[in-house]
C-alpha cells in the first residue's frame, strides 16, 4: 500500500499541487516553515532501507520455500518499527510519520476536499493498476506471492523520483526535481491547468470520480 501510494503521488504530483493551490498558498509554500512548492515524499531511513532491500534482494532471500511461501524481510513488527522511528522532515509536503502519510501542503484554513478527492482517486487508480498487473502475471502461471513482489519491485523503481529525504527548501533540490521530471511550476494558473492534463482526465474517468465536462 505504501508503494502504491508513492506511485499515485509520483504519477500525479502536479495535480496534487493543483488541488491545494490558491494565490495565498502559492505565496506561502516554500517559506515560513511551510512545505516547498514541489511535491516529494519523505519516508525516513528504515522504510527507505526496507524498500531498497525488497527491490534488490534475490527471490531466494525473500521467500521461504519450505511449506507455505512467505516473505522474509528480517525486520521487527511494522507498527513498532515505524513508531520508534518517526522522523519528521518538516520540509517534506508528503511525509510518512509513524503510521501514516501526511499531506502537509494544504493551507491551514483551506477546505481539504479537493486535495482528498485527488489523492483518493490517484491512490485508487494505482491500486487498481497494481491488481491488474498482478492478475495478469498469475494468469500467465506465476505464483501469486512472486507476482506481487515482482510488481512491487517494478513500482519501487518507477516511483523513485518522488522519494526525497533532503532539504526541500534548497536551490539544489529545485534543480534536481526538474531533472527528475517532477512538476516545478510556481504559478497558480499553471498548477490549476493540471486538472486538464490528459493523465488527470484519464484518472478521474477510470475511477468514475469526474468526467471531462465536469473538469
Each model region followed by its residue ranges:
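Acidic, glycine-enriched catalytic cores built around paired aspartates
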Residues: 9-215
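Hydrophobic, small-residue-rich alpha-helical packing segments that form membrane-like cores
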Residues: 1-2, 8
